Structure formats: C-alpha cells, structure tokens
C-alpha cells in the first residue's frame, strides 16, 4: 500500500516519476486566468488566520460544508473564524475522492510544512501552526513561493487598472501581473446592470455614450488601454451560446431602445450579443489577443440564497445547452473576414469536449501552433478524472503537445498547489502511454512536451 500523498503522489509508473521530477516539477507558472485581486497583490495582503485565506471566498469548500450539514452561520455567517475552521475540519475527512481533499493537504504541505491530515482531532494544532506561518506569509510571498512568473487577473473594462500600473512600476516584485478584458456587463444587455454599466463606461471613456457606435468606440478604446498595460487576452462568460445575424442599424436601434428602458425581445438580445461579440472579436484579432469563451454554466440557481448572499457563493451548476451550431456560426463569421483571434474554448459540461475539439479543428491555421485551444478542465471538472478526461479528449482529436495547460481560475492565493496536481496527472498520463508501448521512451521529446504544456506553450501563445 502506498503512503498518503508521498513524493510519488499520483505518479504510478517509472516514466511518470522521471517526467515529473526532471521536467515538470520546477517549471515556472504562467497563470493566464485567475480571479486574484491585484490590489491585494500590490499591498502584499496578509491574512489574520487560516480561515480568512482558506474559507473567505471559496465556494468550492462552502458547497461541501453545506452538503455535510454545516449550518450557514459557520460557512458565510457570523460565527467566529475558529468555529468556521473547525466546521471545515469536520467536513474535509468526509471528502474522500474529491479533489478538494487533495488540494487542502497539498496546500498544508507546500505553504505550511504540515504533513498531518486535517480532521477534528488535528484541527487545534493545525490552526496554531498555520496561523504562525501566516504572520510571515503575505500574498506576494505565497506567489513567489509558488514559482509564479505571470498572473493574469480578470478585469472589467471600466476598471482603472490602478494596481496593475503600480505593480508594473514596482521593481521589488518581479512577477508580471497583467489584466484580462472581461466585458460581460456590456454584452449582457438583458440584465439590470447594463444601463448603469454603460454610464460608468462613459465616465472612464471621458465622452458621452448615446449611440451604439459611440459604445463600440468606447469598448475599443478600453481594450487598447488594457493592451498598453500588458493585457493579451479577453474572457467571456457565455452561459447560453447564441447567434443571430443583424445589420449595424438593427443593433444600433436595439441599443437605443435598451438605453431608453424599453423592453427587448429574446431575438433582440441575441442580435445585440452576436454583433457586439463579433465586433470585439475583430478588436482582439487586431491586437493579437486570445479570446477565452467560458460556456455552459448555469448560475445563481437558488433564488432565495442569491437574494441573501449574492453571486459566486456556491449555487451554480453545469448547463446542458446546445452550443455547436451557434458557436460555429460565430467563429465562422469572424473567419470569413480573416478576423478570428486565437481562441480558447471552455465548456463546463464535459459532454462538450468532443464538440469543442472538433470545432477547433475546423478553424486552426494561420501558422499559429494551437491557435484554437480546448481549455483546461474547468470548475466542476477540475478533478483528477476531469483533468485526465480533458487531456485524453484533446489528444484523441488534436495535439495535446500544443495545449496551453492549467489555470487556477481561483480567488485563492493558495490555489497554485493545483498546478502541481495538474502536472502530476499530466506526467502520469503520458507515462502510462509510454509504459503501455503506445509512445516511445524518448526522454528528450517527452520532456519537451511536458515542459511545453506546463510553461512554454502558454508563454508563447499569449506573447508574454
């Protein structure tokens, strides 16, 4: 029987161990999609205790605690931090087979030097040990300890990027922190947030926005500003993939109606989103950016809890919407104008992997290695099985060797341990193929493939 999470954790063959130790383990991290707060990075935020850094905004953990019967007061409520930590310590032993069990203990090992298993018995001593370490461990220290080279945060076009600019000038911190352009609030015309957001966009743009062409000019201007601060990617939450062709005049009228507070139809929503996303795609192409599409999430399912806690609190799920037809139409509309940017396609529904991977193959080209990417296993799929399946699906239908690799997609500074988790799974999968006689034992080639997926592909793809 193997020991729990020893140095060969998840590495089940000799080739995997060689690949991980020699080629993957020490590669820097390019975290090209996360939700870290740049202000907290700039200020080197410190954490008063392990509860703040672990449970402060982690809806992955919150879902498990609710499932374990923990009362909400110990999750997002007014219980004190130690009580919340004990509630988590009571929950985590029940998470057998869940990646959060592995992530929790990897984080204890890598950042706190703790090999103990977290449970109700060990909780008091782990509370003391972690809090002692946290006195000397700020956000920047965690990032540096994780061997991170580049971080791409997720940012609204109306953001001033104040802290990205400050970080750019900070000579004492050699990690690059770049913004990512996420204009969802300007695309989702059906939501109550749309009109207030357009007003805020006008403020940062410095000009009135009373027409659709002025709105598009403002979006382009903000993208160019983001580019000047180092942005090389956009990100879009496409919960429902739609495509409805329309003329500029049609969409301009829809925009005008929206600003006037008039009720729009579903087809008008679709026409507006299609035209606006297509315009943005052309902007991204001209800037040399990558466009990330996160598809098929079903958000804020629990209305009662949404009204109490708001979004991103653990009440989302996988959607099962049809995406192929509309996605192909959208990508093709850009390709016909030679304006399709580099694109990373993520679906929260794993049934879509083959759909996305085959669609990608229809739009590769331009002399760009892996121009169209099947995004890493995301959110509910970020597990042992989910990561392996995503890599197998990509290998079956494309080139795994051109994969840009793992992202944390996280709000937690400790989540860089997930890169180690991914790298171990990657090396084990490749090792299995080699040891099964499905690929030659050519360490030079194998090592290069591993290092490319862990680091070089992403760095070259985004042009960092």
From Swiss-Prot:
Reaction(s) the record says it catalyses: D-glucuronate = D-fructuronate; aldehydo-D-galacturonate = keto-D-tagaturonate
Enzyme Commission (EC) number: 5.3.1.12
Main EC class the enzyme belongs to: isomerase
Pathway membership: Carbohydrate metabolism; pentose and glucuronate interconversion
Gene3D superfamilies found in the cross-reference section: Metal-dependent hydrolases, uronate isomerase, domain 2, chain A
GO MF annotation terms: glucuronate isomerase activity
Source organism superkingdom: Bacteria
InterPro entries according to UniProt: Metal_Hydrolase, Uronate_isomerase
Keywords of this entry: Isomerase
Family matches, as Pfam families: UxaC
Gene Ontology BP, a term: D-glucuronate catabolic process
Alphabetized PANTHER family for the sequence: URONATE ISOMERASE
HAMAP family the UniProt entry points to: UxaC (MF_00675)
Family per similarity comment: Belongs to the metallo-dependent hydrolases superfamily. Uronate isomerase family.
Protein name: Uronate isomerase
Source species of the chain: Caldicellulosiruptor bescii (strain ATCC BAA-1888 / DSM 6725 / KCTC 15123 / Z-1320) (Anaerocellum thermophilum)
